[in-house]
Amino acid sequence: MTGVGENQLISIQPDELKFLFELEKQSYCDLKVANKTENYVAFKVKTTSPKKYFVRPNTGVIQPWDSCIIRVTLQAQREYPPDMQCKDKFLLQSTIVPPHTDVDELPQDTFTKDSGKTLTECKLKVSYITPSTTQRSSESGATNGDGQSSETISTIQRLKEERDAAVKQTQQLQHELETVRRRRNQRNSGNGLSLKLAAMVGLIGLIIGFILKLTLASPT
């Protein structure tokens, strides 16, 4: 078994899973797994708390010198862990497989240690970060003259303002569109009524004309 982030077959970045922890909210961390060999390498991700995390993909095959992204999602939690300390751990197993092997073709004993094949393992620790910690880090960076942090905050604020303006404009356009629809419906309703009146007047005229014709045609 190799150390954190170290593996003879693959490289893993980052070497620690860090999640922004907020109650009733999901959080995720992406792992980049790169194949460092000229062979096809299969991998499998295991965790000590499988009900707490959602891993996709948790099993896969990486082509030679290629890489893939594994997304580990922390499910929404209802309470804070003691002292915000996380004892969860992840284990990433990897082994060489025949060329052009598909993940659906992997035998059940691919990641079994007594299968006679070389199986390397890499442990990953888990840590939680609170929003307040992130905010303090940003403020500390600004205090130390980190212009990039202040620039990032300004960018976020600008994006929020643009989003609010776009939402307001969308609502205004929807209101105007609804007004146009109401006016058009009223106009169509008025035109329908006018046509009905015209039809009735025409019908009455025909009846009167028919009666007059009969009257004139009657012998005196």
From Swiss-Prot:
> What spans does the record annotate as topological domain Cytoplasmic, numbered to this chain?
1-196
Principal subcellular localization? endoplasmic reticulum
Q: Where is this protein found?
A: Endoplasmic reticulum membrane
TM spans (from-to): 197-217
Residues that bear N-acetylthreonine: T2
Membrane topology, as annotated, equals: Single-pass type IV membrane protein
Keywords from UniProt, A to Z, are: Acetylation, Coiled coil, Endoplasmic reticulum, Membrane, Transmembrane, Transmembrane helix
Region named Disordered: 133-154
Which InterPro entries has this protein been placed in? Ig-like_fold, MSP_dom, PapD-like_sf, VAP
The disulfide bonds in this chain are none
MSP domain mapped to chain residues: 9-129
Coiled-coil annotated residue ranges, if any:
153-188
User: Is this entry keyworded Methyltransferase?
Assistant: no
Query: Could you name the Gene Ontology cellular component terms for this entry?
Result: endoplasmic reticulum; endoplasmic reticulum membrane; plastid
Which superkingdom is the protein from?
Eukaryota
Residue numbers of N-acetylmethionine PTMs:
M1
Q: What PANTHER family is this protein classified in?
A: VESICLE-ASSOCIATED MEMBRANE PROTEIN-ASSOCIATED PROTEIN, VESICLE-ASSOCIATED PROTEIN 2-1
Q: What does this protein do?
A: May play a role in vesicle trafficking.
Q: Which family does it belong to?
A: Belongs to the VAMP-associated protein (VAP) (TC 9.B.17) family.
Q: What is this protein called?
A: Vesicle-associated protein 2-1
Q: What is the scientific name of the source organism? A: Arabidopsis thaliana (Mouse-ear cress)
Top-level taxonomy: Eukaryota, Viridiplantae, Streptophyta, Embryophyta, Tracheophyta
Q: Gene name, please?
A: PVA21
